[in-house]
């Protein structure tokens, strides 16, 4: 297996750039595809009110994702720069810092949101008829936030390590898990929104487990060694990823505003 340095050695041609970029693009499209499938299946098995509850509560999930991607993207940039300077140990520290920080961040924010769900739902403007659906979904999903942020960190570092195809395979496994268990839990087992949340949580677990297995192997191009976060690298990573956070935050605010306008003028059916 090539090392990371060997992967990026030599002249970087357009073809080489595309070989690295296309799997990452396909990964993003795949993630969006199974999110759409998730919504379709919820509408089919649970109903349109449940789907609107998912849409109304989504800004909460998206905000947690935005915070995690800031660290993941920033950490990936720090690691890539270190690899370019032949500082392999610094790249490994950046990887460990991004992963451990995101797991701790996901655990902290997820639990805070879990205990403050009623206040969050009021802020988001969730209607009374949507509340039970949203609560069933978020009570399962929020404690699993560390799994998603770990999987998101691994997605970034597959590309940093020069192995975007491995990331695409992990995303495919995660997406297939989500759809299969959506059908099983909401169909034959009739678990409603709780089933949809468990299917999503299981898909996050698969994504995190794939990344952990891949990067903990001895032959991994960027072998993960878990340590406490390096605060200096963490500050740099957060600074590098700030643009990613602001971009995602604007998306969260836009969704929240659209939802508030739609529900005030069209009711739950319009969300």
Question: Can you say where each PLM-predicted feature lies in the sequence?
Answer:
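Hydrophobic transmembrane alpha-helices of multi-pass small-molecule transporters
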Residues: 63-66, 110, 178-183, 207-212
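Residue-level signature of transmembrane alpha-helical cores of multipass secondary-active transporters
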Residues: 20, 24-28, 62, 102, ...
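Small-residue-rich hydrophobic transmembrane alpha-helices
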Residues: 51-111, 148-167, 259, 263, ...
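Transmembrane alpha-helix boundary and packing residues in multipass membrane permease domains
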Residues: 24, 28, 39-40, 77, ...
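Helix-terminus/linker motif at the lipid-water interface of multi-pass membrane proteins
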Residues: 33-52, 121-128, 184-191, 245, ...
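Alpha-helical transmembrane segments of multi-pass membrane transporters/permeases
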Residues: 89, 102, 158-183, 194-201
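Short alpha-helical transmembrane segments in multi-pass integral membrane proteins
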Residues: 1-21, 79-146, 188-242
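Small-residue hotspots at the loop-to-helix junctions and early N-terminal turns
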Residues: 46-59, 134, 138, 197, ...
């Amino acid at each position: 297996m090539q090392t990371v340095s060997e992967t990026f050695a030599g002249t970087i041609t357009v073809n080489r750039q595309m070989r690295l970029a296309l799997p990452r693009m396909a990964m993003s499209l795949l993630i969006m595809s199974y999110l759409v499938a998730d919504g379709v299946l919820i509408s089919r098995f649970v109903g349109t009110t449940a789907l609107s509850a998912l849409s109304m509560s989504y800004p909460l999930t998206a905000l947690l994702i935005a915070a995690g991607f800031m660290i993941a993207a920033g950490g990936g940039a720090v690691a890539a720069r270190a690899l370019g300077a032949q500082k392999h140990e610094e790249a490994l520290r950046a990887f460990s810092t991004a992963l451990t920080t995101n797991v701790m961040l996901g655990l902290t924010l997820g639990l805070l949101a879990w205990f403050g769900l009623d206040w969050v739902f009021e802020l988001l403007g969730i209607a009374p008829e949507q509340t039970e659906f949203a609560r069933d979904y978020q009570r399962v999903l929020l404690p699993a936030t560390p799994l998603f942020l770990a999987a998101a960190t691994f997605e970034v570092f597959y590309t940093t390590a020069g192995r975007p195809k491995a990331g695409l395979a992990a995303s495919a496994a995660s997406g297939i898990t989500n759809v299969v268990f959506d059908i099983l839990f909401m169909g034959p087992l009739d678990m409603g929104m709780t089933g949809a949340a468990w299917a999503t949580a299981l898909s996050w677990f698969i994504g995190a487990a794939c990344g952990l297995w891949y990067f903990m192997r001895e032959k991994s191009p960027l072998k993960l060694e878990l340590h406490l976060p390096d605060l200096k690298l963490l500050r740099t990573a957060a600074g590098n990823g700030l643009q990613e956070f602001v971009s995602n935050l604007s998306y969260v605010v836009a969704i929240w505003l659209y939802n508030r306008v739609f529900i005030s003028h069209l009711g739950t059916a319009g969300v």
